[in-house]
């Protein structure tokens, strides 16, 4: 069966333009491919002046202006759509609630699922567009029978398929990723932008969480949830330190622990468990982080759901590596067993399954199994 990247026919494309170089080049490539492209910048902050500190953050008035200038150079219509309230409800408040519950969310996945390929896509389809184009590094491969598959980018070093693993068949059918099927370095993308006359060619990349411009996640959460002093305990339950809010930690964390009593072996301690119920954080040795299996909920499939147990590779973080697993859907939940123990797996994170380069689907980690103990 033959396969081709993306789609050959001319489409009405809505290009999401963040004001950065990747989305600008993606829009330019879509237009160059012959599609009827319109640019749109998403206003996601009620206070856009506070969304950037240096190279951090995004979604500012400056970004909107950069996106408009890029659209003018490309020669496409351009609009700004205000989705700030939807973003606050579906991404920011979800982020806060997940941390408050002791879990570790990924707001980029949630934004793709709820904003770019839901709120934006729905509005685009209602206006007669065929597809939404973004600057993500991933590939949509169309099989001979018309089936669309999400694959890793040709350049594995820049692959972003993990944060797109939440897309279902309907969303994937209207997704366009012009950057994903070529092996190019970021310097080459910037050089292409410069050749095209795009002023964003030298604009720094944004980093970290877009709505936490200074990168201080704990400070952001403390401002929203307030300080709540509690104990840091070791595996025996002995108090070894204190904290100002259990919500400010994540499984596997080492830095920022206020521990007054050193470990008997003198080795570093890591966060093993977070209990919002009694506001305690449990710490222990690195070896205690070894996870052999996990259960994940709310699975979303890029194609048909697996009908039985299978062998896959799994990715657990946006910039994490692959690991071999067996996985099976049991009573609507994904049961995953690792071929070798892995560390730093936190409830709330997404597990994305791959068959080679193809994204099979994703689910949200609910519990993990370490040796003989399940952690929720």
From Swiss-Prot:
Cystine crosslinks: 111-210
A Gene Ontology term for the protein's cellular component: cytoplasm
Biological processes per GO annotation: tRNA wobble position uridine thiolation
Keywords for this protein: ATP-binding, Cytoplasm, Disulfide bond, Nucleotide-binding, RNA-binding, Transferase, tRNA processing, tRNA-binding
Location of this chain's protein in the cell: Cytoplasm
Any Pfam family the entry gives: tRNA_Me_trans_C
UniProt catalytic activity: S-sulfanyl-L-cysteinyl-[protein] + uridine(34) in tRNA + AH2 + ATP = 2-thiouridine(34) in tRNA + L-cysteinyl-[protein] + A + AMP + diphosphate + H(+)
Positions of the record's site feature: Interaction with tRNA: 136, 349
Residue sites binding ATP per the record: 16-23, 42, 135
Active site: 111, 210
Family: Belongs to the MnmA/TRMU family.
HAMAP family (UniProt xref): tRNA_thiouridyl_MnmA (MF_00144)
Name by which UniProt lists this protein: tRNA-specific 2-thiouridylase MnmA
Organism: Streptomyces avermitilis (strain ATCC 31267 / DSM 46492 / JCM 5070 / NBRC 14893 / NCIMB 12804 / NRRL 8165 / MA-4680)
């Amino acid at each position: 069966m033959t396969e081709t990247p993306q789609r050959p026919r001319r489409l009405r494309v809505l290009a999401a333009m963040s004001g950065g170089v990747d989305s600008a080049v993606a829009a330019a490539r879509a237009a160059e491919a012959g599609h009827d492209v319109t640019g749109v910048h998403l206003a996601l902050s009620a206070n856009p002046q506070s969304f950037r500190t240096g190279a951090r953050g995004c979604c500012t008035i400056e970004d909107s202006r950069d996106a408009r200038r890029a659209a003018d150079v490309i020669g496409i219509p351009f609009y700004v759509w205000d989705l700030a309230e939807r973003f606050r409800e579906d991404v920011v408040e979800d982020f806060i609630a997940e941390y408050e519950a002791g879990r570790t969310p990924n707001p980029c996945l949630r934004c793709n699922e709820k904003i770019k390929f839901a709120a934006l896509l729905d509005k685009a389809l209602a206006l007669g567009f065929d597809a939404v184009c973004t600057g993500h590094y991933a590939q949509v491969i169309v099989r001979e029978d018309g089936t669309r598959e999400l694959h890793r980018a040709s350049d594995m070093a820049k692959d972003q398929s993990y944060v797109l693993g939440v897309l279902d068949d309907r969303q994937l059918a209207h997704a366009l990723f012009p950057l994903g099927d070529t092996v190019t370095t970021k310097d080459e993308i910037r050089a292409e932008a410069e050749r095209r006359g795009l002023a964003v060619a030298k604009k720094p990349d944004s980093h970290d969480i877009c709505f936490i411009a200074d990168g201080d996640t704990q400070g952001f959460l403390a401002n929203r949830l307030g300080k709540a002093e509690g104990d840091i305990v070791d595996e025996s339950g002995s108090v070894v330190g204190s904290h100002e809010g259990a919500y400010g930690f994540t499984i596997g964390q080492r830095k920022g622990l206020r521990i007054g009593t050193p470990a008997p072996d003198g080795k570093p301690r890591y966060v093993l468990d977070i209990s919002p119920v009694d506001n305690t954080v449990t710490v222990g040795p690195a070896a205690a982080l070894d996870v052999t299996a996990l259960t994940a909920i709310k699975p979303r499939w890029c194609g048909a759901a697996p009908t039985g147990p299978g062998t896959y590779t799994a990715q657990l973080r946006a910039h994490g590596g692959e690991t071999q697993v067996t996985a099976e859907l049991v009573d609507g939940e994904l049961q995953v067993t690792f071929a070798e123990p892995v560390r730093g797996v936190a409830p709330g994170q997404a597990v994305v399954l791959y068959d080679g380069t193809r994204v099979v689907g994703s689910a949200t980690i609910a519990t993990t199994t370490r040796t003989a103990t399940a952690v929720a």
